[in-house]
Amino acid sequence: MNKLRLFRSFFAFLLPFGMATGAAHGALTVEIVGGAAQQIPIAVVPFAQQGVIPGQQDTIANVIGADLRRSGLFRVLETRGVANQPSDISQVNYQDWAAIQAQALTIGNIETLPGNRLKVSFRLLDVYKQSQLVGMEYNITPSQLRLTAHKIADVIYQKLTGEQGVFATRIAYVSKSGGRYALQVADSDGYNPQTVVSSAEPIISPVWSPDGTKLAYVSFEKKKPIIYVQSLVSGQRTVLANFKGNNSAPAWSPDGKRLAIVLTHAANSQIYSINADGTGLQQLTRTTAIDTEPTWSPDGRYIYFTSDRGGSPQIYRMPSSGGEASRMTFEGSYVVSPRLSPDGKSLAYIRRDGGQFRVALQDLQTGQVQVLSDGPKDESPSFAPNGRMLLHATRVGGRGALAAVSADGRVKQRLSESGGDVREPAWGPIISQ
């Protein structure tokens, strides 16, 4: 296969959507399969309310429970059979919760405040030790109730697992419905989708800035691939790269100052870096091969990328300033779409096995590889910012859908949008708030 055909085959796999039509872009729905070998049994009591909060009666408890459940690490217990439903620690009868085998208990209340504000308070309790693990209060607007529930779930997750939660993060993805493409940003559970930009032409390769305030992406609206950077705060959009030929595959450096990009303006597909304001273009690879899909290591020292310089697509690593590249993958004849785990210890990618494209995870110290997803047409892996889960695109019933799989392969989720295709996922960073 010549290099032009190979380059086209990369993007024939990564680019096209199905021709499905449907309604306007909507929220994603989550289906969960599997769980960790040892799940923590936890009870989340519906929060008591002081004052009238229309339409929000069970939002907090339901969202917290759903978040913990979809992590695969918790077994969320049914609470309706327990007669005493406490909202304050003085009301807790620990024997009631020990009887349903709860190890942890979450209680709380929502209070209306002047000026259309709410005070949300919660406590996480250790049922066995009959003590409080953590308690917090939030002063919010009604529109922040779901986000607050995600934050509470993050606190619970971190307290009980020792790892940072990611429920309050956001995801970006591209949907297609009714012949239009839309770059969407939604909560990590698929709720509250917001359109960043829409077009009659394809949009691909969204990637978050490290501070979570911007998205870089590729749009074909000018009948050629151009890289844009768009602020999620102001909505302002700027052109990052519009050189002769193709401009594709943006990837932010960990400090947010530069992006690695792929250009064909000189000849074949090569990797460059560029300042975030579009200045300071620097060529990093100079080969006769196809070099594409760059991604930075978390420490900023290296760039991993896909290249066919060995005869078939494989993953290579080079210094972030350019220089000699080392091959990183040796299992499989077709390996693309590298992504580094947040701790830099694992490399995720798409590997073709027997005509099936699946997400695989490679330990960079031992070289051990584990196939995580089921295929047959998985693509675009993206790590959660705590490294526990990977989001990726797949095909279900002829439509594009998003899926997530835990880094150990035990927990699998599917996120689908009724009436349209979704793909090109990118999991946003944890933002301090």
Swiss-Prot record:
Residues 1-26 form the signal peptide. GO terms for cellular component: periplasmic space. Keywords: Cell cycle, Cell division, Periplasm, Signal. Its main location: periplasm. Pfam families: PD40, TolB_N. GO terms for biological process: cell division; protein import. It is found in: Periplasm. HAMAP family: TolB. Belongs to the TolB family. The Tol-Pal system is composed of five core proteins: the inner membrane proteins TolA, TolQ and TolR, the periplasmic protein TolB and the outer membrane protein Pal. They form a network linking the inner and outer membranes and the peptidoglycan layer. Part of the Tol-Pal system, which plays a role in outer membrane invagination during cell division and is important for maintaining outer membrane integrity. This is Tol-Pal system protein TolB. It comes from Methylobacillus flagellatus (strain ATCC 51484 / DSM 6875 / VKM B-1610 / KT). The gene is tolB.
